[in-house]
């Protein structure tokens, strides 16, 4: 009798455990929440996730593949490549379609710099596994057309290499929401596409905003201001930066009321803190073109301040926060 009771009890414990196991790992509480009210004239929130969870390997790891291509965006044909992050369970023969993010790295960095760091890769895996974000594809190009000499032509990169070479290659190879990779296909799927960038990559992200509102709804510029001819210039007047945004909106009038910018920056230890906050503050005050908040159905601008250093790896935290809005 005792054996039967013990067996029954063991079976009950196993059965009770099955639902818990099927649910998988649970999203942990955030490690820290930073709120500010007096930096840009609006209430901002930054959530720092639990590093011990998100930076460790996920039970559902995605994969990173390389795509090679040639570009004539700068005159002579050049060889280049992008890294592409594919979420766990991606099936090249399947039917599911995925949101896509193009991420541009910082100064002196390349296609491998962010996704090649295991903390960044693990963070993306874990965010998808526990439901912070729906499964997505993430692409890592490089805007240096001659990396050895650190040569950049941001206009050619934004208008030609990204639009004519990288996007058609990636989205004809992998299953995004673009059913075709011509202008019509990209326009029809723009709600499922985002550009992001850190530091000089933030500058590159702004240039995508200037040229590709027809192809993406979401933009995530992290830790920099807007620059003109002098790349990464810290002294361009805020008024000129705002005018560059307004000119871009005028030139892409069909999308003037259909975009969302999720900006973020470090704290006072971040060398871009002052210029970045000044730009966002001016944008918030410009209520003709911007509405601050996290409801993407009525707002088009939000800002998070981490209090951290100027490091591209911080982008994993900024993405974590941005996923409260982006693709929602």
What is each PLM-predicted segment?
Residues 1-8:
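Positively charged n-region of N-terminal signal peptides that target proteins for export
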Residues 18-21:
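Sec/Tat signal peptide C-region and signal peptidase I cleavage site
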């Amino acid at each position: 009798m005792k054996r039967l009771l013990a067996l029954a009890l063991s079976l009950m414990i196993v059965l009770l455990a099955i639902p818990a196991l099927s649910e998988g790992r649970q999203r942990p509480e955030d490690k820290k929440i930073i709120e500010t009210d007096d930096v840009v004239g609006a209430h901002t929130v930054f959530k720092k996730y639990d590093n011990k969870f998100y930076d460790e390997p996920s039970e559902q790891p995605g994969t990173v593949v390389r795509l090679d291509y040639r570009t004539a965006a700068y005159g002579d044909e050049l060889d280049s490549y992008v890294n592409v992050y594919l979420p766990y369970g991606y099936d090249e023969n399947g039917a599911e379609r995925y949101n896509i993010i193009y991420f541009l790295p910082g100064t002196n960095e390349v296609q491998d710099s962010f996704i090649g760091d295991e903390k960044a890769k693990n963070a993306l895996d874990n965010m998808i596994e526990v439901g912070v974000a729906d499964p997505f594809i993430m692409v890592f190009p490089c805007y240096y057309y001659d990396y050895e000499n650190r040569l950049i032509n941001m206009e050619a990169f934004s208008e030609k290499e990204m639009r004519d070479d990288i996007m058609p290659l990636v989205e004809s190879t992998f299953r995004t929401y673009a059913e075709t990779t011509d202008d019509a296909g990209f326009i029809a799927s723009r709600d499922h596409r985002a550009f992001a960038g850190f530091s000089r990559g933030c500058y590159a992200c702004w240039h995508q905003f200037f040229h590709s509102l027809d192809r993406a709804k979401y933009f995530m510029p992290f830790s920099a201001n807007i620059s003109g001819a002098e790349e990464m210039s810290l002294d361009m007047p805020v008024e000129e930066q705002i005018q560059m945004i307004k000119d871009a909106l005028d030139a892409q009038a069909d999308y003037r009321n259909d975009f969302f910018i999720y900006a973020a920056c470090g704290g006072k230890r971040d060398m871009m803190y002052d210029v970045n906050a000044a730009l966002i503050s001016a944008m918030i005050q410009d209520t003709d073109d911007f509405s601050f908040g996290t409801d993407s159905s009525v707002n088009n601008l939000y800002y998070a301040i981490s209090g951290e250093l100027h490091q591209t790896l911080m982008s994993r935290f900024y993405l974590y926060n941005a996923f409260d809005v982006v693709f929602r």
